[in-house]
A protein has these predicted regions:
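Positively charged n-region of N-terminal signal peptides that target proteins for export
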Residues: 1-6
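Hydrophobic h-region of N-terminal signal peptides that target proteins for export
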Residues: 7-19
């Protein structure tokens, strides 16, 4: 019986340690509903949160962000397990799910809140993003240069509850961004 308790305690402790190995990444690529849906489908992504980042106003609302006056972008915070999916792989997905050459626009959505931006937590992540941008610019895949902003992660404000898991709640697989 004592051994069972030790094993249970060990497993709980191990689960806590493993959970703490998760990392977060933040991406802005147009309307956050579709971006969130894409990242949710990846193995190694544990959770996503849609929200606002890159602006001047604390705790902005969707309505305020949509005015374009706050400087925020609609963004997705991705919590992931780096032993399953790397930051580099997340950046690859980010660049494939939107057009990184359009300034402040994705599809029919126009405004600074729909800009392309990838956020980094350290110099290694910054280097990964910049290398991928350079590779895209040299690839000839686009007729215009990549305009994705590369910025440090600062304040990320969760969007309102009705925006979280938007497509999941409605039984929609995703959208063509």
């Amino acid at each position: 019986m004592k051994m069972k308790k030790i094993i249970i305690i060990y497993l709980c402790f191990l689960g806590t340690i493993m959970a703490n190995d998760n990392k977060k990444a933040v991406f802005a690529a147009g309307c956050f509903w579709g971006v969130e849906s894409t990242f949710q489908q990846l193995d190694g992504v544990n959770s996503t949160t849609v929200g606002y980042t890159g602006g001047k106003v604390k705790n902005p609302s969707y309505e305020l962000v949509c005015t374009g006056l706050t400087g925020h972008a609609e963004a997705v915070e991705v919590e992931y397990n780096p032993s399953v999916i790397s930051f580099s792989e997340l950046v690859d997905v980010f660049f494939k799910l939107h057009d990184p050459t359009t300034m402040n626009r994705q599809g029919p959505d126009i405004g600074t809140q729909y800009r392309s931006a990838a956020y980094f937590s350290n110099e290694d992540e910054k280097g990964i993003i910049e290398e991928k941008i350079n590779n895209l610019n040299e690839s000839g895949d686009f007729t215009s240069r990549v305009v994705t902003e590369v910025e440090p992660v600062e304040n990320f404000y969760d969007a309102e509850d009705y925006h979280q898991d938007y497509y999941k709640k409605r039984g929609i697989d995703g959208c063509a961004i």
